[in-house]
UniProtKB/Swiss-Prot annotation:
Domain of life: Eukaryota
Reported function: Required for the cessation of distal tip cell migration at the end of larval morphogenesis.
Similarity field: Belongs to the NSRP1 family.
Species per Swiss-Prot/TrEMBL record: Caenorhabditis elegans
Keyword Signal: no
Coiled coil (UniProt feature): 76-132
Disruption phenotype annotation: Early larval arrest, continued gonad expansion and shortened lifespan. RNAi-mediated knockdown results in continuous distal tip cell migration past the midline during adulthood. In a rnf-5(tm794) mutant background, increased severity of the distal tip cell migration defects.
UniProt note on tissues of expression: Expressed in the intestine, nervous system and head neurons in both larvae and adults. Expressed in the distal tip cell.
This protein's name: Nuclear speckle splicing regulatory protein 1 homolog
């Protein structure tokens, strides 16, 4: 039979919770209340917590053994409060006047500002009277004692201000002559220096560095051939050529000299010193005459930069020497006396007179009267132009 349908609003009833099934108690079960309490993390005390509690208990027992009334706070409260009250009374007695920290300075600053204001008002009144002229000369003038006192205070304040201004003016850095002398010297040096000369000097230093780098020893490298090495072709998986057909190339050595049995150590080249670089720069050996001189000349030009004046002189001297006849060389070699090694090792005799002459030459005055006068004239010209400010 079909269920009856109600016409209208059908409200669905909520599902009631099912009642838990009643468990039948066991015959051998215990009905203690402690069995139903769930075991939580708070009930389970760890070993570390127990250890801390035991240590605290031991400390309490020691303290009670020394003083039985140590934890009797209610009994000792009156004594503690009495000690606090005594300290407060001592502080009050020490500060009878109850002087404040900042009030005195604030009052002084306020009085100073008032005096400054009175001084400004007085100046303004004087300017107004000057404008009025003789308009109110026939009127009586009344001056009270308070106004006179105020005028005296304003006068003292003005004197104090003048003293402070004079002291600050004397101790200011701008008025110190030593500072001005130092500043004037640096200013003169900066003006005397020509900026173009400084730039030129920097360029010369750069050129010298480049020349030193270019004149360093260049290792003879093999000529680069235009032919590129044949690229290795990847072996195809379909090729029938065996690996044995292609003989492996021996490894190429990466150092100079012949291979020897054992460990072939490569000797590191020592870094050239500054003196050696100068020697290399000044020394240019004459190449032997050969057919390929024309081919080597452009390479040498590329490697070496513009020759220095010292190197040019050395080249000219060598060329002039090479032009001379071999007979002259033989004559010179015959005339030159041979010096033995003992004579070379003997200490040289010092000529005191020659040494004194050299010292006098070094220490003699180089500025003539004309140079000093010219420098003096230049200084006066700069002074007239306003470049040099004389120290006052």
């Amino acid at each position: 039979m079909a269920s009856k349908r109600h016409v209208g609003l059908n409200i669905r009833k909520k599902d009631e919770p099912k009642a838990a099934p009643i468990r039948v108690s066991s015959v051998f079960g215990d009905d203690d209340d402690d069995d139903n309490v769930p075991a939580t993390a708070t009930n389970m005390a760890s070993a570390s917590v127990i250890r801390v509690q035991k240590a605290a208990e031991r400390e309490h027992q020691k303290a009670e053994a020394e003083d039985p009334t140590i934890f009797d706070y209610d009994g000792n409260y009156d004594e503690i409060q009495a000690i606090k009250n005594e300290k407060k009374e001592e502080a009050r007695k020490a500060d009878k006047n109850r002087e404040s920290k900042y009030a005195e300075n604030i009052i002084k600053a306020h009085a100073r500002r008032q005096l400054e204001q009175f001084s400004r008002e007085e100046r303004q009144q004087l300017r107004e009277r000057e404008k009025e002229g003789d308009e109110f000369d026939d009127k009586e003038v009344f001056v009270t004692g308070a106004y006179r006192k105020q005028q005296e205070e304003v006068k003292k304040h003005r004197e104090q201000e003048a003293e402070e201004a004079a002291f600050n003016d004397m101790t200011s850095v701008q008025k110190q002559k030593l500072w001005e002398i130092g500043m004037g010297r640096t200013l003169l040096n900066d003006l005397a220096r020509d900026p173009t000369a400084i730039k030129q000097r920097k360029k010369e230093q750069k050129n010298v560095r480049k020349r030193e780098d270019s004149d360093e020893e260049i290792d003879p490298k093999p000529e680069k051939s235009d032919k590129k090495p044949a690229e290795k072709l990847k072996k195809s998986i379909y090729s029938d050529d065996s690996d044995e057909e292609k003989a492996p190339k021996p490894p190429q050595k990466n150092f100079e000299g012949d291979l020897k049995p054992g460990l072939n150590t490569v000797s590191k080249k020592k870094a050239t010193t500054h003196a050696e670089r100068i020697r290399q720069r000044n020394y240019t050996p004459t190449p032997p005459s050969s057919d390929d001189e024309g081919a080597r000349a452009p390479r040498a030009r590329r490697r070496t930069s513009s020759p220095s004046p010292t190197s040019r002189k050395s080249i000219e001297s060598r060329e002039s020497g090479s032009r001379r006849s071999p007979e002259g060389k033989s004559e010179k070699s015959e005339k030159a006396p041979k010096i033995s090694l003992k004579d070379k090792l003997k200490p040289k005799k010092i000529d005191k007179e020659a040494r004194l002459d050299g010292l006098k030459e070094i220490l003699k005055q180089r500025n003539t009267e004309e140079d000093i006068e010219a420098a003096r004239q230049r200084y006066f010209e700069r002074k007239e132009q306003g470049i040099v400010v004389p120290p006052l």
